[in-house]
């Protein structure tokens, strides 16, 4: 049975496995089906409806922040961002504690901290405390939710003076217009102060949900992402940030666009090489050659970004950090238009397309055959990227936290 499942996964991916499981369940008699307990599954929502304020005294102590996070996993850009800010805030004298919002396995305080050091670039000598659950979460000046699920816990947590929402994407759009969509959307109405990844989210949450929001800008690791000489062998190299299991990264849309593009290149004897980076896609058949790079270690990604001439960085919701990382390597970034992207990208520093495979293919072909235009915009993208700074973003978040504490205390 296990070998059969692995074969299906290899050939059809997780969608194929889930399809088989659903069919198997539906074919069984009702008496043999283990009934789902919806209330138990969403108990974190039912049990987190009251804000039970408690009286406590944190005078004459350093600022303490509780961070409530989703479970850890390799390659999570959201966790990497949070650890980046924790590193900066710790330099400013702020004490940080990290809690997972629910029990997920056999994690210990020590294993979580080591994982954050190994995978999320937490400072090796950090004094940040890590806890595998929130059962005994202690008093703090500020408690920060970092996802819609964790927001429900923070809503009910009373041992804190202030509540903040560290928003990195518009999470309702991770779902169809379903119960989960509204569960996620409702968290923006909890009255938390928002700190958002970029101005698109800040404007959206302020306008649509009347949240008090502050945003920080993106940057990149300047020790890792640098230009390298491009190969001059007559082949134009194109990369795709390929996240098949992450719908908001528009994988299917760009796979179709690349097929249209590749056919046109073949017809006109244009030599191209296409690479996919982000997830293993060996189980998918493509009608054109693909260099499947899969999931790579952070230290190996910059070389791929720099060696490609063009990199496709699609996003249906908020941008990832990949566009800036690509631009920092003097590689031309191509993305789809939309307010979610154009708070950072524009026609001067990147190529923007409609979310249409034909338009993507046409614009991609244009910069493939026009080296001068490609290199000019890539240079402008590089000049834009190098002006960004995580230090500036860290200072901005630090000032927001100080202002929250000072402003609220005045009331």
Language-model regions, residue ranges each:
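Acidic anion/phosphate-binding donor-loop and adjacent secondary structure
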Residues: 43-56, 172-178, 214-235, 303
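Acidic donor-binding loop of glycosyltransferase active sites
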Residues: 306-318, 331
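A short, well-ordered alpha-helix in the C-terminal region of glycosyltransferases
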Residues: 359, 366, 373-387, 395-399, ...
